Amino acid sequence: MLARDALNALYTFGGVFAGTALGWPVFLAGVFGVVSAISATLVSWIGGRADRHWGPKPVIVACALALTAVCVLITGLGRQQIFGLPVAPGSHLPDALFFLCGVLIGGAGGAMQAASRTMMVRHTTPARATEAFGLYALSGKATAFLAPWLIARATQATGNQSLGVFPLIVMFLLALVLLSWVQSKGEAQQ
């Protein structure tokens, strides 16, 4: 739930961040979305092959770590500076880095969602699949407010939209901690 909420917040607030913190026009935010979608297609395919070879848990871990790295990069990204280091006026470095973030958000997000569903299949039986996937869908809705609320509180507390992403780092890391107790092969097959 935590990783899904954080990922959904990245999807939702990516364009908002680009428009407000980086000053992107709507057109460029649209290009960002297309780039993210294309990377989601390619990396999800690669993630599916990795899932088949190593199982879903390592894919989920790798994707959550990549998304955590994206959040860390966003916390230090701005039009005039990157992690406190000044950026030359007119530099496209912040834009290029945020496009890289979009590639990683789309790619790692798509692969993580697919691997999460594979993990669900491993943790249910055919007789309980509808119930398990129904609870999985409900859990995503039950806490959907959490990440946006935390982003709003962090942004308000720091006065910095980039630092407002910090709670997502915590959410991804907590998800990884909780994932350590999940059995890779699934309970249904043991």
Language-model features: where?
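Multi-pass alpha-helical transporter architecture, strongest
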Residues: 77, 165-190
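Cytoplasmic membrane-interface "Motif A"-like loop-to-helix N-cap segments
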Residues: 52-66
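Short amphipathic helix-loop junctions that connect adjacent transmembrane helices
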Residues: 12-29
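Helix-to-loop junctions at the C-terminal end of transmembrane segments
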Residues: 42-56, 82-83, 155
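C-terminal ends and interior cores of transmembrane alpha-helices
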Residues: 65-91
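Intracellular juxtamembrane helix-capping segments at the cytosolic ends
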Residues: 111-124
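Loop-to-transmembrane helix entry/capping segments in MFS-fold secondary transporters
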Residues: 26-27, 126-136
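A membrane-interface helix-boundary motif in multi-pass transporters
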Residues: 90-93, 153-172
